[in-house]
Amino acid sequence: MAPKAKKEAPAPPKAEAKAKALKAKKAVLKGVHSHKKKKIRTSPTFRRPKTLRLRRQPKYPRKSAPRRNKLDHYAIIKFPLTTESAMKKIEDNNTLVFIVDVKANKHQIKQAVKKLYDIDVAKVNTLIRPDGEKKAYVRLAPDYDALDVANKIGII
């Protein structure tokens, strides 16, 4: 049995062939590479363009565990002050007086008093005593009585 003759791809119709030829002619005349206008540099300095900076993808964390917060609510407030002047503040100004950690700021003191004693704080004044301790004057909100709170805490 004789081998079958291979069928060649059907020849494209005349219109398609003509269009293809025109396209080729146009490409030869114009050139296939685009001609982009060259941007004129007006400055002698070259500013490198900002490129994409990908986020780091570390293979392992550099710290095995997050650091423990050493300044928690219980560490911030050391003890309430029970001197005569502190008692006068409680009675006259609706203010409690505490000795607090030197590193604590007013916001932290306010949050600690709120959490530990369940009271609202109007404002906090602080000073550092000559012996190096920090003293905090905690003014309570008008709807709380400092005398009652001091009684509950056990100052009086």
From Swiss-Prot:
Gene Ontology cellular-component terms listed: cytoplasm; cytosol; cytosolic large ribosomal subunit; cytosolic ribosome; extracellular exosome; nucleolus; nucleus
Keyword Nucleus (UniProt): yes
GO molecular function: cadherin binding; RNA binding; rRNA binding; structural constituent of ribosome; TORC2 complex binding
Residues found modified as N6-acetyllysine: K70
Effect of I99T: Found in Diamond-Blackfan anemia patients; uncertain significance
Region (Disordered): 1-67
Region of interest called Beta-like import receptor binding (BIB) domain, as start-end residue ranges on this chain: 32-74
N,N,N-trimethylalanine: residues carrying this PTM: A2
Function: Component of the large ribosomal subunit. The ribosome is a large ribonucleoprotein complex responsible for the synthesis of proteins in the cell. Binds a specific region on the 26S rRNA. May promote p53/TP53 degradation possibly through the stimulation of MDM2-mediated TP53 polyubiquitination.
Domain notes: The N-terminal beta-like import receptor binding (BIB) domain mediates interaction with IPO5, IPO7, KPNB1 and TNPO1.
UniProt family annotation: Belongs to the universal ribosomal protein uL23 family.
Protein name as catalogued: Large ribosomal subunit protein uL23
Lineage, highest ranks first: Eukaryota, Metazoa, Chordata, Craniata, Vertebrata
